[in-house]
Amino acid sequence: MIEDIQEDADRRMAKAVESLKHDLARLRTGRAHTSLLDQVNVEYYGMEVPIKQAANVSVEDSRTLAVTPFEKHMVPAIEKAIMASNLGLSPVSAGQVIRVPLPSLTEDRRKEMVRLVKNEAEQARVAIRNVRRDANSDLKDLAKGKDITEDEERRAQEAIQKLTDRYVAQVDDLLEEKERELMEV
């Protein structure tokens, strides 16, 4: 019973951290990385598919992505999809390769992005604390029903708190790393 509650809490906290990682990867930092285009879909044989399924996306240099379509006729469609993606990118076609230069971020935009990142991190922390609250509530219910002793409840709550601390520390590390990345010029 206690193990089930702890495993569930661990799984849900890990999910909150994964969600934060996913959200942070979408934010543009001014440095090229392939995950920047993960959310971009292109029409490929009548279906909307992620750009990765129609082209090879690679980092050419710190400010440029290279998109190489698997099929030559996909170049205009991929170019159009990147422009329509609301990422503020302007792809340049060079034969079979589409180069996507990343404009540098202004100081105001960097600060706004840091604010966004801090907000995302706080939401992840709140989600982790909510999982802790739910787990502790479940433990209290077990103790009230005399299914576990008070000592077992206290030990389990301490274990849940250690889990919470570990995942909140991961969130803080992700936040710090992303802030540093954003403020780099």
From Swiss-Prot:
Its main location: cytoplasm. GO terms for cellular component: cytosol. Keywords: Cytoplasm, Protein biosynthesis. It is found in: Cytoplasm. GO terms for biological process: cytoplasmic translational termination. Coiled coil: none annotated. One of its GO terms (molecular function) is ribosomal large subunit binding. The keyword Cytoplasm applies. InterPro entries: Ribosome_recyc_fac, Ribosome_recyc_fac_dom, RRF_sf. Responsible for the release of ribosomes from messenger RNA at the termination of protein biosynthesis. May increase the efficiency of translation by recycling ribosomes from one round of translation to another. Belongs to the RRF family. This is Ribosome-recycling factor. The gene is frr.
